[in-house]
């Protein structure tokens, strides 16, 4: 596996790869602390390409506060061992200076306006602007044929599809399903920070999403806003009683995250909630 830390070196490597007409490049952007969910992305990448590039960069621009950034798990050595085992072709793990030579606070920003301030964007100041900015930089540096993201961060996935469309990137966006623990908790790098008691409660989010999806299907309330708002309120109370501080619990069109209506064919139920200081996100899609 080739390990690259400088953007200039990456540019040269990509240029040489592009000269080979049969090279099909897949990119999987990550912030490291790799787990089974990332392995699923890698499996798709290896299946759909012949050059697989993983990026590991903990992007300060997408954190709401400096404490979260400092506390994010940094496991580069362990990640490198895993990527070698998974037979990844290239690891791009740039320094902060390499990605933001003038400082990220002074950097030109990319704002996908339709998605940066709704749902999770309401409570996570500038998060999606930071994500869109770093993904744009990676796309510009690598110019992959495909890029692969997980469905757990569903709003991010939809936003990136919009980014590709609006900025005329010739990149196919693929997604991988959520990978869960034995009890239903969605795998996340932040799970390691949960206390034993918080870890026991954490799967309640997925349980609530399952109950909610069954309730909606059973009652056929796909396009009656007043009805599903009432249902959401009941489950919001349940989550609060379990000890969660709910930031988002919403039913949206799975294609564009707009409110569902009579023309919606698939919905997504989104939940973002804190337990203690740890923020968990999850979702479940349902056919309408």
UniProtKB/Swiss-Prot annotation:
The reaction proceeds by a bi uni uni bi ping pong mechanism. It catalyses: (R)-pantoate + beta-alanine + ATP = (R)-pantothenate + AMP + diphosphate + H(+). It is found in: Cytoplasm. The active site is at 38 (proton donor). Pathway: Cofactor biosynthesis; (R)-pantothenate biosynthesis; (R)-pantothenate from (R)-pantoate and beta-alanine: step 1/1. Its EC number is 6.3.2.1. The lineage of its organism: Bacteria, Pseudomonadati, Pseudomonadota, Gammaproteobacteria, Enterobacterales. One of its GO terms (biological process) is pantothenate biosynthetic process. The keyword Nucleotide-binding applies. GO terms for molecular function: ATP binding; pantoate-beta-alanine ligase activity. This is Pantothenate synthetase. Keywords: ATP-binding, Cytoplasm, Ligase, Nucleotide-binding, Pantothenate biosynthesis. Belongs to the pantothenate synthetase family.
């Amino acid at each position: 596996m080739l390990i690259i830390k400088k953007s200039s070196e990456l540019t040269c490597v990509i240029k040489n790869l592009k000269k080979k007409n049969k090279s099909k490049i897949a990119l999987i952007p990550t912030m490291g602390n790799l787990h089974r969910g990332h392995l699923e992305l890698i499996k798709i990448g290896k299946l759909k390409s012949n050059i697989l590039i993983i990026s590991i960069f903990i992007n300060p621009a997408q954190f709401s506060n400096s404490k979260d950034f400092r506390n994010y798990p940094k496991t580069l050595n362990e990640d490198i061992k895993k990527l070698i085992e998974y037979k990844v072709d290239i690891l791009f793990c740039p320094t902060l200076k390499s990605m933001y030579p003038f400082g990220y606070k002074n950097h030109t920003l990319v704002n996908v306006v339709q998605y940066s301030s709704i749902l999770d964007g309401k409570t996570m100041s500038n998060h999606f602007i930071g994500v869109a900015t770093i993904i744009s930089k990676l796309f510009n540096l690598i110019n992959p044929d495909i890029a692969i993201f997980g469905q757990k961060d569903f709003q991010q996935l939809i936003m990136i599809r919009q980014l590709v469309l609006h900025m005329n990137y010739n990149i196919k966006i693929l997604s991988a399903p959520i990978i869960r623990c034995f009890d239903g908790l969605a795998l996340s790098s932040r799970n390691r920070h949960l206390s034993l008691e918080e870890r026991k409660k954490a799967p309640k989010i997925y349980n609530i999403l399952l109950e909610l999806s069954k309730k909606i299907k059973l009652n056929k309330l796909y396009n009656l806003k007043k009805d599903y708002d009432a249902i959401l309120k009941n489950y919001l109370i349940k989550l609060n009683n379990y000890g969660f501080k709910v930031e988002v619990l919403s039913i949206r069109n799975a294609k564009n995250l707009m409110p569902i209506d009579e023309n919606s064919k698939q919905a997504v139920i989104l939940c973002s909630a804190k337990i203690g200081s740890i923020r968990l996100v999850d979702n479940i899609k349902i056919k309408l």
